């Protein structure tokens, strides 16, 4: 199971930028990989394990922030198309079970 986190956070003031950067660092600390500036993903061996992370992500959303979270199965993730420039690239493979721990 993959979890995709997409967000739009206010960054007009210095304190808003600090909170937005803190949210990005929180995602990285939780094991998410950055796909784009405001798009992160994480692989879960067990879909039930997402609950704890969902709660942490919810309580960390800065005021005025908009966050959308999508869960995708391995087959849904494998069906995505990825480009780097005009070149089509392979998508990320799920990590080996031992790599997750």
Regions found by a protein language model. Name each.
Residues 1-4, 9-101:
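Basic nucleic-acid-binding interfaces
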């Amino acid at each position: 199971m993959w979890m995709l986190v997409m967000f739009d956070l206010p960054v007009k003031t210095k304190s808003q930028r600090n909170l937005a950067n803190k949210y990005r660092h929180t995602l990285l600390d939780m094991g998410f990989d950055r796909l784009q500036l405001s798009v992160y993903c994480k692989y879960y061996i067990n879909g039930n394990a997402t609950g704890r992370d969902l709660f942490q992500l919810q309580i960390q959303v800065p005021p005025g922030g908009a966050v959308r979270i999508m869960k995708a199965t391995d087959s849904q993730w494998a069906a995505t198309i990825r480009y780097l420039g005009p070149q089509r690239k392979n998508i990320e493979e799920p990590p080996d079970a031992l790599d997750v721990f």
